[in-house]
Amino acid sequence: VKVSGEDPIVSTTGKASRELFEVRVANGQSHKYDFLTVGSMGHASMIAYGLSEQLHQGKIVCVDGDGAVLMHMGTLAFLGKQQPKHYLHIVLNNAAHESVGGMPTGAAGQSYAAIAKACGYPKVFQVDNASSFVSVLQNAQAYSELTMIEVMVKLGARDDLGRPKETPQENKERFMNYWEEHTK
C-alpha cells in the first residue's frame, strides 16, 4: 500500500481483503482507496478492468488470489486482448483456496505469469520473496502497460487476522465517493 499511494486497489474476496484492511489500519491510512470484493471470488480482476477504462493517470491495482484467477481464467485472455494501460495485476499464489479452508486449487506448479504472458500480458514477473516483490512493484509503477506480478506465498494466515469494520455497502459508498473525485 505504500507503493500504491492514492491509486485504487481492488482486492479479491477473503483473506487478501482482510489483510489489506488491517494494513491500512496499521499505517493510519484511509480505506477509501480500496474496493474489497467481498463474497465475489474471481470477480476482482474484471471490476478492476472496468475502473481502469475510466482512468487517465496512475494505476489500478488488482490483488487477486490464484484460486480466484483459476475460477475466471478467461479474464486473463480478455485482459491480454484489451491491454488496459493503467492495470497492475498482483496474483498471490499459495496453490490453495485459503479463505475457504485451504483446499488445494489443483493447479499447483502452474505459472500464472506464464499463462498471462501467453494471453498477451506484455509484462509478467514471478517473485518468491519480499525484497524481490518490493523491487518489481516499485518498477511496475512506471510501466504504462498491462502488468502481472505473481507472488509465490505459503499457505497460512495469522490466527488473529481480523475482518473489516465496515459493511460491504459502506465500503462501496466510500470507494465510489473517492473514485468520483479521483477520475474528474
Q: Which ranges hold each PLM region?
A:
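Glycine/aspartate-rich loop-and-adjacent alpha/beta segment that forms the canonical ThDP
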Residues: G5, V23, A142-K184
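Active-site pocket-lining segments that scaffold enzyme catalytic pockets across diverse folds
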Residues: V1-P8
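Short acidic loop-to-helix transition motifs that present clustered carboxylates
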Residues: A16, G42-H43, N129-F133
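Short acidic, glycine/serine/threonine-rich loops at helix termini
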Residues: L20-R24, M73, V100-P104, D159-P164
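Conserved thiamine diphosphate
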Residues: M103-N139
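Glycine-rich beta-alpha junction loops
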Residues: T13-S17, N94-A96, M152-A157
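Thiamine diphosphate
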Residues: R18-N94
